[in-house]
């Protein structure tokens, strides 16, 4: 009996020691994984408080297939030993091929996002993915991430538009996966026309456009569908996380960015303006954005069709995001980035495919069409920033201009003032000149007791090219200035004719200082009233073609 008891005690002791060792080993492994995750988060540069990373569960574990042989699909296009992994796709295909098509990724959303709830009757969407010679591993991972991380009821179909890839089976074999459909172009059409083709056959009321080298994150679709369901004129985009082109690490992007651009129509990510940051108390609220990157967004199909889809005369890729963004804002819609929606994207440093007319010429053609249709008089700044566009062919835009008129879209000036006031209008300075009426010239006439320059009319002296300082005016875009002071109306109301015109410290954003030439008139841009001479002062008055006091010569002409 003693022997049995001793053996039992020995067995229990060994079991306790082994159990303790296993517990400590597991605990240490969990802490190591957590530390590794936090390090990756900092590397991604996400400006949020530190928290434990969450690995996303798969909603569907292993996408059911109808005879789809994943191993055969991927192995058919694997790299040969010694082959450059960057050559064909401009990212490390070797690293992509190593990864599972169902790989887990980090939940990069703000910690408040999981607590949000969405409508139980969100509309289903057609996901449209266009590609040309995409790596099979990234294309498959894009498709499976959508199916694995989206409730099945929200995905009506995934439409793959194969833009004349070298191997038709890149697309066709994927149709063995449920909900996946394949359209193949019989010639190279480019992303823009391929997307239109996919949208035309889509059966859902909402369209979701994705690039072919993405991985969607947890609850990526629900917050975007919610915004579109609440207002069908919204076009919404996720925060676009970064998938490294070198090792395919999934890195969190900043939640404080929006889309912007310069006058050459070059897209850039920029910080949300400070005043918007100050009023932004809820990090889950959508961010207004002047433009979207264009690769990933959700739009109501009827709204997409109403707006005129894409400009089908644009070629291959580039510039279509500006054309769509201007059209949405100026024709009654809005653009948003939804912070609780995250999608990873492989950003490449070069295009892995050829443009029939070359990358630069294609981009010029597309952006020039955008400028000619949507930028009104501000298109001059596009040409100044991109002089290589001058004289380049861009096709007819008559139908696009007519469509804009039919939709009664707002002006580009409205867009700058209401959507993107942060885009500074370039100041185009010219040589000093005079503002002449008969034999008299507009001049500053000393200062008052407050130090303000006084305005009046005096006999012209000197010449237009070399006037005296008091009669020398600098004509810049919408500003008439002298010695750092600008001509300003005291009222911007059309109902206030007779308001005095004074000189103020120049402020390019001040509407009271905005003027334009209209024939021989100098017209106030905001009120529409005209500059007129009175015996003792200058005023703004209702424009009258027979009013000699409103007729001006600007020498030299700008």
From Swiss-Prot:
The protein's name: Polypeptide N-acetylgalactosaminyltransferase 16
Ranges of residues in domain Ricin B-type lectin: 428-555
Cytoplasmic side: 1-6
Task of the protein: Catalyzes the initial reaction in O-linked oligosaccharide biosynthesis, the transfer of an N-acetyl-D-galactosamine residue to a serine or threonine residue on the protein receptor.
Root EC class: transferase
Known cofactor(s): Mn(2+)
Similarity comment text for this entry: Belongs to the glycosyltransferase 2 family. GalNAc-T subfamily.
Catalytic activity: L-seryl-[protein] + UDP-N-acetyl-alpha-D-galactosamine = a 3-O-[N-acetyl-alpha-D-galactosaminyl]-L-seryl-[protein] + UDP + H(+); L-threonyl-[protein] + UDP-N-acetyl-alpha-D-galactosamine = a 3-O-[N-acetyl-alpha-D-galactosaminyl]-L-threonyl-[protein] + UDP + H(+)
Species this protein is from: Mus musculus (Mouse)
Known EC number: 2.4.1.41
Positions of substrate binding: 163, 188, 212, 317, 348, 351, 353
Disulfide bonds, paired cysteine numbers: 113-340, 331-409, 441-460, 486-506, 530-543
Database matches in Gene3D superfamilies: 2.80.10.50, Spore Coat Polysaccharide Biosynthesis Protein SpsA, Chain A
Recorded name of the encoding gene: Galnt16
Main location: Golgi
SUPFAM superfamilies according to UniProt: Nucleotide-diphospho-sugar transferases, Ricin B-like lectins
Disordered, as annotated region: 34-53
Chain intervals for the UniProt region annotation (Catalytic subdomain B): 286-348
Superkingdom of the organism of origin: Eukaryota
GO biological process, one term: protein O-linked glycosylation via threonine
Annotated keywords: Disulfide bond, Glycosyltransferase, Golgi apparatus, Lectin, Manganese, Membrane, Metal-binding, Signal-anchor, Transferase, Transmembrane, Transmembrane helix
Subcellular location: Golgi apparatus membrane
CDD domains: beta-trefoil_Ricin_GALNT16 (cd23479), pp-GalNAc-T (cd02510)
Biased composition (Low complexity): 34-46
Chain segments carrying region Catalytic subdomain A: 122-227
Stored PROSITE patterns: RICIN_B_LECTIN
GO MF, one example: polypeptide N-acetylgalactosaminyltransferase activity
Pathways involved: Protein modification; protein glycosylation
């Amino acid at each position: 009996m003693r022997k049995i008891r001793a053996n039992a005690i020995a067995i229990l002791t060994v079991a306790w020691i082994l159990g303790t060792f296993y517990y400590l080993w597991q605990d240490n492994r969990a802490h190591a994984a957590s530390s590794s995750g936090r390090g990756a988060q900092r590397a991604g540069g996400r400006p949020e408080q530190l928290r434990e990373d969450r690995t996303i569960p798969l909603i569907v574990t292993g996408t059911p297939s109808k005879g789809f042989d994943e191993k055969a699909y991927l192995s058919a296009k694997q790299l040969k030993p010694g082959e450059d992994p960057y050559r064909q796709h401009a990212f490390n295909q070797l690293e992509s091929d190593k990864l599972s098509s169902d790989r887990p990724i980090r939940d990069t959303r703000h910690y408040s996002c999981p607590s949000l709830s969405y409508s139980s009757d969100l509309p289903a969407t057609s996901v449209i993915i266009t590609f040309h010679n995409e790596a099979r591993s990234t294309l498959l991972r894009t498709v499976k991430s959508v199916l694995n991380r989206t409730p099945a009821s929200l995905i009506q179909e995934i439409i793959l538009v194969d833009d004349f890839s070298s191997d038709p089976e890149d697309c066709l074999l994927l149709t063995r996966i449920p909900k996946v459909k394949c359209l193949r172009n019989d010639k190279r059409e480019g992303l823009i026309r391929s997307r239109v083709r996919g949208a035309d056959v889509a059966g859902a009321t909402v369209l979701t456009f994705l690039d072919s080298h993405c991985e969607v994150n947890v609850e990526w679709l629900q917050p975007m569908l919610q915004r579109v369901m609440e207002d069908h004129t919204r076009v919404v985009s996720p925060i676009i996380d970064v998938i490294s082109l070198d090792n395919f690490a999934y890195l969190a992007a900043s939640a404080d960015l929006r889309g912007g651009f310069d006058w050459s129509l070059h897209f850039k990510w920029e910080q949300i303006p400070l005043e918007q940051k100050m009023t932004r108390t809820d990090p889950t609220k959508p961010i207004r954005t002047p433009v979207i990157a264009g690769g990933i967004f959700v739009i109501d199909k009827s709204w997409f069709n109403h707006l005129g889809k894409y400009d089908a005369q644009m070629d291959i890729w580039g510039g279509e995001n500006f054309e769509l963004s201007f059209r949405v804002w100026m024709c009654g819609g809005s653009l948003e980035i939804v912070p609780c929606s995250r999608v990873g994207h492989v950003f490449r440093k070069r295009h892995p495919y050829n443009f029939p007319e070359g990358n630069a010429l294609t981009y010029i053609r597309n952006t020039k069409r955008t400028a000619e249709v949507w930028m009104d008089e501000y298109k001059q700044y596009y040409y100044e920033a991109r002089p290589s566009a001058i004289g380049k062919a861009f096709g007819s835009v008559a139908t696009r201009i007519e469509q804009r008129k039919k939709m009664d879209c707002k002006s580009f000036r409205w867009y700058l003032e209401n959507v993107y006031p942060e885009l500074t209008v370039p100041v185009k300075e010219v040589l000093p000149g005079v503002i002449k009426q008969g034999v008299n010239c507009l001049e500053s006439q000393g200062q008052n007791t407050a130090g303000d320059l006084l305005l009046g009319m005096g006999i012209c002296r000197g010449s237009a090219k070399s006037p005296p300082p008091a009669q020398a005016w600098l004509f810049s875009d919408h500003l008439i200035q002298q010695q750092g002071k600008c001509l300003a109306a005291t009222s911007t109301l059309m109902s206030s004719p007779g308001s005095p015109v004074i000189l103020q410290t120049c402020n390019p954003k001040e509407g009271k200082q905005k003027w334009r030439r209209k024939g021989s008139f100098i017209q106030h841009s905001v009120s529409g009233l005209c500059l007129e001479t009175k015996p003792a002062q200058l005023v703004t008055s209702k424009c009258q073609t027979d009013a000699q006091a409103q007729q001006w010569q600007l020498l030299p002409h700008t």
